[in-house]
Amino acid sequence: MYLSLATEAQKQQRDLLTHAAWGQTLSVAEFAAREQRLRAHPWTAAGMRTWLLTREPQGGGEVLASCETFHNDSFLRTPGGALEAGDSWSIASVYTEERLRGRGHAARLMALLASHLEGASPRAHAAVLFSDVGAALYQRSGYREAQAWDWVLPAVAGSAAAGVDALLQDADVARTLAGMRRPEAPFFLWPSAAQLDWHLERERIYAELHGRPRPGACGARAGEASALWAMVAKTRQLVVLMLDARTPAQAHALLRAAAQVAHRAGLSRVVLWEEPGTPALVQGLAGAERVAREDALPMLRPLRPGLPPVEQVPFPRGLWV
């Protein structure tokens, strides 16, 4: 079995097959159009690759499994406290046709891909994925999982602008992200503004296909604190992509604004992925509930020695692919 990059024709063939797994609420044609549009986005056009496991070299023969990789900037803290920049990759859309499952094809694909990524850059740090099928499959390829908790807040009526200094629009994303503090963690991946806009592009696509309005803001600012978020239409959620708050009062103001934006957009709730400092910021916010996440389990495989355990790595929702 061989690892190879997919051609454009092979990508389109996989789109038709993977609709069953990820095309909920869309027709096959709509899903295929969504995939082509997302691949054309500047972030994915620059750093996304589609990989195949095939029976013959150079993509020949039957396709046994497929996945996608997305490039991320990552940072490893040195013993002296400086940040060493590197390259990491997020893996998504791991797929094997039902008729080919149970034969270890996905595990073989992940093992070959990890070996390739180890030599893809002299600055290689890690491969990351967000599993919807538990941890066991990917543990066999050297991945280790982190605990995954969400803070869930119901959408509520009210003026989103009343409790914050500003509501943010798409054009504010890059400036807002640039002003956010980097984590104090020993290792972390950091999204680009283009990656966050990719989340908003998904929002735009579903708003168009479902004929529904987009939320009236994609974030908010309260003093020096800020948050960025995006709609996930098929689950009626507003997901917080990035949150940088210094105090509980700031976090509460930003999340209340998100809940009010969600209500006005016809969404049911706000979801914030827990990071190491999240409980101290969010506890005490009326209506907020901490729940175990049922999908998108963060998992990490080091591509070099010296990385800390996955439990010490923060995973904001903005990194999800």
Predicted regions and their residues:
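Active-site/acyl-donor-binding loops of N-acyltransferases
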Residues: 130, 136-160, 230-321
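Amide-forming acyltransferase catalytic core, primarily the GNAT-like/NAT-type
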Residues: 147-242
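Active-site rim helix/loop that mediates acceptor-substrate recognition in acyltransferases
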Residues: 17-81, 182-219
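Conserved hydrophobic beta-strand within the GNAT/NAT acetyltransferase core sheet
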Residues: 94-96, 125-131, 270-272
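Glycine-rich phosphate/pyrophosphate-binding loop shared by adenosine-nucleotide-utilizing enzymes
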Residues: 59-67, 89, 223-228, 236-238
